[in-house]
Structure formats: C-alpha cells, structure tokens
Design a protein with these regions (language model features):
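Preference for long, amphipathic alpha-helical scaffolds in soluble/luminal domains
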Residues: 1-601
Length: 601
C-alpha cells in the first residue's frame, strides 16, 4: 500500500465513521429508518380537494394546514413545482391553483391570480388539455372545471370498462388502477351516457367496486390505496362524487390524517421505509458493521416486512417486499434490495426467506430477461391505466415496463444470494436484455430515475456482482461513465448537463467499484472525493429531485441519497484496500458475512 493509499484510507475511515454515526442516530427503535419523501404541492392539492369534497367540516384542521403550506410555498414566479423550492411545473401549479380556487377563492384570490398567470405562461387551458404538455391532464382539467377556471370541453372519460378485462389482463395493470376504477365509477355517474355506454357502466360497476374493496382488505385499517396519499385522494374524490361506498371514503380520510407531514403537507407516496432500511443496511455491511447489533436489528425488520401472501392485483406470488408498511405493493426493486441485505448478513438460498425472495424474482422475470416493477410483462407491453387518462399509451414515461435499475437489482440479488450461479440461463437472458437496451455510446436508460447515469451505474454494478465485469456491456458502461463524469468529479445528467447529484454520483461509483477499476485512477478518486466533500454539517447528503413517480411526477428521498452514497464510499474503500483488482469471476463479496444456514435469525 502506498503512502497515497494510506492517506486516502484515513480520510475515508473518518468520513465513514461520521456518516454511520449520523445514520445510527436516525434509526428508529424497531431497527428501521424512516425514508422520508419530500412534501409535494401537487399531492397536497389533491388531498385538499378530496377532503373538501368528502368532509370539509371533519377535516377542517387538516385543510387549514394544507392551505397554509400551499400559500407559503408559492414561487416568486407564481408557480409551484413538484417539490418545495424547485422549478415550477404545469402539474404542480395547476393542481395548487385548483385547490385554492375551490377551497379558498376569496382568501387566496391574489395567489390564485398569480398562479393562473403562471399556468397561462405554460400555455393555459390549451396546455392543460394537451397530454404531451400536462401529464396529469385528466386530473388537472377536472379539478379546474370544479373550481370554475376551465370549461368541460374536451374533458376525457376514464373508462370503467377496464374492470371488465379478464383477470390475467387486469393483473397486468399497474398501480394507477385504483384511480382508474374510482374515476371510472365517477365518470359513469356524472357524464352523459347513451344506451350502449349505460349498459357498459352497469356491467362494470360491480367489479370496479369489488376491486377497490379487495384492496382495502389488503391495505388494512391503517393503509391507504397503494400506500399513497395522492392515489388515496383520487379514490376518495371518485367515490365521493359517484355517491358510492362512504366507508371506503372514510378509510381514505383516516389515511390522510395519518400521513400528513409536520409542515402540513403530503408526499406523492408514503415514506419509503423499506427502501431506506435496505439501502442503509447494505451500506453498513459494506462498511464492515454487519455484526453490529443495530444492523442485525435492521435485518430482522427487513425480514419481518416480507409479504407472505399472493398479491392478486398484479399476479405477484408471496415472498416479495413493498416499499412501506403495512401495505406497499410487492415489487422487484424492494425485493431485490431486501434479498441483498439479508444475504449480506450471511444467508444464502438455504435460508427460507432468501430462497422465497429470490424465487419471487425469478417468477417475475419478463420473457425477454428483464424485470419490471410490479407485474411480469409478456410480449405485449404492460398496460397502465394512466394511458386511458392521458392518451399516450406508448410513452416510455407512462408505461411501467422493463426497467434497467429494477433488472439490475434483481440480477445482483440472484447472484449474491447464490440462487443463480455464473452462467445460469436466467442471468444470461438478463445480460442479453442489457445488451439490447444499451445505447451505442454505452449509456442505459431506466424508468424510475431521471437520466441515464442511474441505469448505467446500476447495470455495471449488477454485472460485476455476477462475474461479468469484463463483458462487452460492462466495458461500454465504464466507457460511458468515464466520458460523462462532470468537471467537478461527480456525475449527473438528470437535472441538466454538468449538474452532479449525490444519487447519480453514488450509483456511478458503485458500478465502477464493483467492476474493480483502479482506485488510484482519477475517475473513481475524484468521485469519492466529491461524495465526501458534498456532505452537509450533519455528515449526510441532500437528496435531489430525480425520482420518477406516477405520470412524470418527481420526488426526492433522503435515504436513497444517504444509503447509496454510504455504499459507494465503503466499496471504494474496499477497492483501495485490495488494490482495485477483480478476477471477473463471481465470488462472494468481502463485505458479506460467511454463509451460515444455522445462524439464528
């Protein structure tokens, strides 16, 4: 080890010690981390409209807090973004204006006027009706009609006949389905219908209600639809205006009270506690703290979060993980990351929970070798009912089909758990899919984060985790990351050229370190330096607005940044210690504990 290496390790040791201490201070008594999502003006406006329509008296205190949040977060240009203090968007601005105009037309008259002027700058009513400019066109247009700011000309109907699809097809519909069912019921009640349409409405109403009833049973007394305040608001509005199922409406109202944030707002979905705990636990294991009782407690919490029942709404088998409790929907990303965390605790597929999680991933693998988020995709792309709401079914921003990040997490989990040894045909199929979707320059897109850095770094990490660090796809990923590193040493193309983010820098570094690049080379050294230097006074990192949710809404998540950055620095330190060599053949990573099938859980 050179003097330079020793100096580098000393700095990394200090930074990792400070960061792990800071994260342990945030750990909850049950062993998990909160995984806080940022407050969303758009989601807050949606929830406010729902409470105003369903129970304005009983929800008065929540409504007042939400209105105060919107009033104090309006931008200087009159608009609202997808998050506080971010660039105004048509979705965020129009939703906020609609809520204020519907609930407080006099008290907020000046703010409404400024907000509508910003909507006009986006293109006004014409832009709202244009699904290419307003991804939430149906929601936004309808709310502005309710508020008296737009006419109902061109208002789109949400087709309740989606409820009549055969079960195998209906299971392919993604997590916008509850909104589609509730708004389909609303449209059936409110919009004019001829004889044929009326017959369809009558036939589709019972299965649509049955679908929502079933989800309430899954979500439990403390859950909301899709564990999302925004989705729950849409269901609440649809059923309220349809005059149906006041019990389900009350269920939603209870959920709003449970999920309001301290600032008086709501996020697009419930806090990502499973993501956070998976990411941070893996990071602690990379650091070498796997035997720490606090990390062991986190692993026990992850185990307890595994779903033991079929999820009939997507066709997913038992054994998966969702993003939150009690009822986040089982998905490939959370399941892959949970398997990785448990494997890092010294358990391979001889462990029943690891085996079930890994088998869940194999059962969900698509025909082409990829993975999607919720449902297995056949040769026809997964249908998302949001296409029926916005009219752009083929848009890659709407379809929740195969995703490079989801696929990478699944591949890493299958390799690190021992479920799929090198050369396994399931891994070969995944590799072929990565090769197919990789751009000629080496970059790889993904569904759930903006930009290409997240996809490229994640795929590189996964390939290295299963012994394919020297493959052509991996080499092209490295080349792309080399060419796209920003002048400040970080990575980031999601927010614009040259704008480095913690998440993208960490994902790039994870891929490079897993692939065994020379740690003395400027590229990884500068990346690690960027991460160390961009911690805050609390020794943690500030998240960026690059997570993609329903219909192009964006969010930021604190522990995606913290967890990935922790992993990246720890893996870089390991790279420095071993000199950057990699055999290119699969071997159990050095940060994982020795497999012990008899280990007490």
């Amino acid at each position: 080890m050179t003097t330079t290496d020793a100096t580098r390790l000393t700095g990394l040791d200090a930074a990792l010690a400070e960061t792990t201490d800071a994260l342990f201070a945030l750990q909850r008594p049950d062993g998990s981390w909160e995984g806080r999502l940022s407050a969303s003006p758009g989601a807050t406006a949606d929830v406010l409209i729902a409470m105003h329509l369903a129970d304005p008296v009983g929800c008065r205190d929540l409504i007042e807090r939400g209105l105060a949040f919107l009033l104090r977060t309006q931008g200087a240009d009159g608009g609202w973004g997808d998050d506080v203090d971010t660039e105004a968007t048509l979705n965020g601005t129009a939703l906020s204006v609609a809520a204020l105009a519907l609930i407080a037309p006099d008290a907020a008259a000046e703010q409404i006027s400024r907000g509508w002027a910003r909507v006009e700058q986006f293109g006004g009513a014409e832009a709202v009706r244009d699904v290419e400019r307003c991804s939430l066109a149906v929601l936004v247009h309808f709310y502005l009609v309710l508020a008296g700011l737009m006419s109902n000309e061109g208002l789109l109907r949400v087709p309740i006949e989606l409820a009549l699809l055969p079960a195998p097809l209906r299971r392919k519909l993604t997590f916008a389905m509850p909104t589609a069912m509730a708004w389909g019921l609303m449209c059936a009640e409110l919009l004019p219908a001829g004889r044929a349409r009326a017959a369809i409405n009558r036939a589709a109403t019972p299965p649509a209600i049955a679908y929502l009833e079933g989800l309430v049973g899954f979500e439990g007394p403390d859950g909301g639809f899709v564990e999302s305040p925004m989705m729950s608001a849409n269901v609440c509005i649809g059923l309220t205006l349809a005059g149906l199922r006041p019990d389900i409406v009350r269920h939603c109202l209870k959920y709003f009270r449970a999920t309001i944030k301290p600032e008086g707002a709501w996020a697009v979905t419930r806090d990502l506690e499973v993501d956070a705990t998976n990411f941070i636990t893996a990071g602690m294991q990379h650091v070498g703290l796997g035997a720490d009782p606090r990390v062991a407690k986190a692993v026990r919490w992850i185990r307890a979060a595994q779903r033991d029942e079929d999820f009939i709404w997507t066709g997913a088998p038992p054994g998966g993980w969702g993003w939150g409790l009690p009822s986040g929907w089982p998905n490939s990303g959370n399941t892959g990351d949970a398997v990785i965390a448990i494997a890092g605790d010294g358990h391979d597929v001889r462990d029943e929970q690891v085996r079930r999680g890994a088998q869940w991933l194999l059962d969900q693998q698509n025909y082409d070798g990829s993975w999607s988020c919720f449902a297995q995709v056949g040769r026809l792309a997964t249908m998302d009912p949001s296409f029926a709401m916005v009219g752009k079914a083929r848009s890659p921003k709407v379809l929740y089909g195969p995703c490079a990040v989801m696929s990478a997490e699944a591949v890493s989990a299958l390799g690190l758990s021992g479920m799929c040894p090198p050369g396994d045909p399931r891994l070969t199929a995944a590799y072929r899919w990565f090769a197919k979707v990789q751009h000629p320059d080496g970059g790889i897109d993904n569904k759930w984060y903006l930009g290409r850095t997240a996809g490229t770094g994640s795929v590189l990490r996964a390939l290295a985790d299963v012994g394919l660090a020297g493959s052509p796809v991996a080499r092209r990923c490295i080349s792309w990351l080399r060419l796209t590193q920003n002048s400040d040493g970080g990575w980031g193309d999601a927010l614009g050229p040259g704008r480095s983010t913690v998440e993208e820098t960490a994902m790039a570094m994870l891929g490079l370190c897993a692939a065994g690049v020379d740690p003395a080379e400027a590229m990884p050294s500068r990346g690690a330096g960027w991460l160390v230097e961009h911690r805050g006074p609390d020794h943690l990192w500030r998240p960026s607005l690059l997570g993609v949710y329903f219909l192009e809404l964006l969010y930021r998540h604190d522990h995606t940044a913290n967890g990935y950055a922790l992993q990246a620095l720890a893996r870089y330190r390991e790279l420095v210690r071993r000199g950057g060599t990699t055999s290119g053949a699969f071997a159990r990573p050095p940060w994982t504990a020795t497999p012990d099938p008899g280990k007490t859980v």
